Amino acid sequence: MHAISSAAPAPSVRLPFYRQLYFQVVFAIIIGVLLGHFQPEYGAAMKPFGDAFIKLIKMIIAPVIFLTIVTGIASMSHLSAVGRVFGKAMAYFLTFSTLALVVGLVVANVMQPGTGMHINVAELDQTAVKGYVSKSHEMTLTGFALDIIPKTLISPFVGDNILQVLLVAVLFGVSLAMVGDAGKPILDFLDGLTKPVFKLVNIVMKAAPIGAFGAMAFTIGKFGLGSLVNLAELVLTFYITSAVFVLVVLGAVARACGFSVLKLIRYLKAELLLVLGTSSSESALPSLMEKMEKAGCAKSVVGLVVPTGYSFNLDGTNIYMTLAALFIAQATDTHLTLGHQIALLLVAMLSSKGAAGVTGAGFITLAATLAVVPEVPVAGMALILGVDRFMSECRSLTNFIGNAVATVVVSRWENALDADRLHRVLDGEAEFLPEPERAVEPVVLARHRA
């Protein structure tokens, strides 16, 4: 086992509230909203701060994923565990992604948020959505599969394709495990490199309030507070549906696995506020991986489930896609039969797998879905373009919580979860616990040989 052992540190003193990240992010968001509302020109000019923070996060995502996966897989006693963890994760993703699509479809049929608008498609300004539609044409299933394979071993680290990094990391980790003792020096080096990389994550996260401020000031300055209430019924329906999905559906699976989804949300409050401020679940990916390990999830499970979930487990995006598609159909008086809705569901199941956890990806994925389902006019997307930016925040929050729950659940299924540590961390004792060993527990994972 390649772990960094250390004595348990003395109990630390709880930081004052104003030094805690979640308070700083909340304060920054409020200041951003006020600046964007009262000085919209200055607010819109704050966009570079948000963009800069997102770039900083993207800078560290690739090394965090690579090191976590490689050291986790290479430390496993049996490589069959890799395939087993991946298989269980994909089974979870498929089940709950489909359930999220169905929930959005059912809610849209029951609430009918677009009924009564009687929009004439010919009168809509289609130029605003042309860019999204053109991008959606590139999102074919074959193109998505081929895009996972990088041109070189180095190219994933200079791009922003998480799945390419994941593929290279898995292959390298498996190769390192197969060479046995000959690969031990490399594994020791990568193990040692993990600690400063996660320290770098902590340093970058200190800039989170600045990034949240810039992103929120730009949003309000650009679109105005009035856009928050525009098409209020659709937005409200989406927010309520997502909240019910998290509390009821994810809450039920969490209870079945012995933990509380509300306590998990409280534990991740700083990351959730960051996601809220930036409208990108990707902005908190490195921090999520670190916190899931601290909560008792095995390193190998975290390394496989979290990055994969960012493309295959997007509950919020799935709810949004079917809900928004039916809203457009209702608003344009387009009648969809049960067969049409089932076809929409099947297409969305495929197209949603290519959505990344970045701002605007959900809208592009919706365009890709509607392009394949001719019954719903793609031009109708102009109806929701104005409020999509604010729905993006809810999508990202739901996606983020869904991946956090998935990580704990798959760890539990693998018997690779320190349940006692999880409960203590979720009860607020995280800062009084020693750091978990950075390496995966290969003995625990090996209990379930295929």
From Swiss-Prot:
Protein topology in the membrane: Multi-pass membrane protein
Bilayer-crossing regions: 25-45, 56-76, 90-110, 162-182, 200-220, 234-254, 319-339, 367-387
Function according to Swiss-Prot or TrEMBL: Responsible for the transport of dicarboxylates such as succinate, fumarate, and malate from the periplasm across the membrane.
Keyword Zinc: no
Regions annotated as coiled coil: none
Protein's name according to its UniProt entry: C4-dicarboxylate transport protein
Gene from which the chain derives: dctA
The species this protein was found in: Acidovorax sp. (strain JS42)
Single biological process term from Gene Ontology: L-aspartate transmembrane transport
Domain of life: Bacteria
Taxonomic path: Bacteria, Pseudomonadati, Pseudomonadota, Betaproteobacteria, Burkholderiales
Family, similarity comment: Belongs to the dicarboxylate/amino acid:cation symporter (DAACS) (TC 2.A.23) family.
Keyword Cell inner membrane applies: yes
Record-linked SUPFAM superfamilies: Proton glutamate symport protein
Main localization, broad class: membrane
UniProt keywords, alphabetically: Cell inner membrane, Cell membrane, Membrane, Symport, Transmembrane, Transmembrane helix, Transport
GO CC term (a single one): plasma membrane
Subcellular location: Cell inner membrane
Single GO MF annotation: fumarate transmembrane transporter activity
